[in-house]
Amino acid sequence: MLNAKDLELLAAKGISEKQIEEQLACFVKGFPFLEITASASVERGIMVIPQEKQAPYMDAWDAYLAKNKKIVKFVPASGAASRMFKNLYEFLSADYNEPQNAFEKKFFDDIRKFAFYDALNRACIENEAKDIPALIALGQYKAVVSNLLESKGLNYGQLPKGLLLFHSYPQTARTAMEERLAEGAMYAKNNAGEVNIHFTVSPEHKALFEQLVAAKTGDYEEKFSVKYDISFSVQKPSTDTIAADMENNPFRDKNGNLLFRPGGHGALIENLNDVDADVVFVKNIDNVVPDSFKCSTVIFKKVIAGVLVSLQERIFKYLELIDSGKYSHDQVEEMIHFLQEELCVKNPETKLLEDAELILYIKSKLNRPLRVCGMVKNVGEPGGGPFLAVNPDGTVSLQILESSQIDLKDPEKKAMFEKGTHFNPVDLVCALKNYKGEKFNLPDYVDKNTGFISYKSKDGRELKALELPGLWNGAMSDWNTIFVEVPIETFNPVKTVNDLLRQEHQ
């Protein structure tokens, strides 16, 4: 099935023949729906920490920062901004020249409010010999948009979100990436005054990110009295997945070559595994606000990090107690209670185990990576969110699931999905080392049965694409997971350019 040229390509990517066989088998058998027992809620698995109870967690985080620990902000930033400008691309190709719909009118009515206005105005003067007001007065709206999106101007249609100017300040404007530098200084500064930030970027944009970091880091170091250590990585070619045709055979392009596609954000578990850190914050690049709105974000980042290190301290004490061999029956009961009630890890079979077997079970469940995930109350339709799911070993635990992982044709499961009270804003803090200070090998904790298949096309032919288990979904399936309610004001993603006009981005 594979020829010499194919094998060369596999070797170059670092993909084995066995992986190809496994991936093709996934197309044949598909992925099973996950068995869920309920959507997580405030009554079941989501912690609510009222204002008067936040201080101990914030203090716990501050105490942890004072130790000699490595804290890293991990920011997935490879996404292209092209989808942000979908409406403007449609305007460019429309058979009318002036704004017609509400989106187009809003964009032009409030164009001066965008942080990129001055840069766009300069591009228009250079390329059209007229400024934006003059072009609008002449009805040349499309000239303004093409200077925003195309390479002759700001080229925003081809750049990643991290490099776009998001927010205006009295003397300057900041990109989304710069907002990450500012935010990091506010809650992730270690005892030596260092802030470590790791961006995952696409190979074609890495140099642009590095240039921006080189140009701007000094300003933020001075402003926040910190030292930054900024690093970058790209998705590994070994995480690309093979495309299949409709008969589940390897898809070949018109030149007869195998077609590989990026495996989605789940591939980043490899990048996260390469980060040497005790605690890692994970948040998407576009979920940022200007300094005037950062207070709530910073408070809740410290709160969820405080929950993480407080729980980790207890887990480590229990694991050290187990290793000592000096524990009583009461202490075994205490540990199983902690596992079931605090970590929401339950297995009915544990009632049948003797203490010696129970200890092995407790140790295996406690000695895993730990994450605390912010969850926001649903305001719109239910989407990806927190559930209680059944794991392969029969244990029920907290998981973040996408709708595609749930059998919505089953009325019972559909009802659970629709009763979801919270959604996943991608706001995680993770502990990556065990009680002996050794790094967990994160790929060991991925549930490979949680990928999914999507349908795409290439050269006018349909193909099947394989998405790896999502980074915060199946890629972290076998972690200990805690959900904490965080306020909606901590969730301000920029999905369209006009989102930048919302109050929290002004």
Where are these regions (language model features)?
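Domain-scale recognition of functional cores that engage charged ligands
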Residues: 10, 14, 29, 36-379, ...
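Long insertion/accessory domains within large nucleic-acid-processing enzymes
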Residues: 410-411, 433
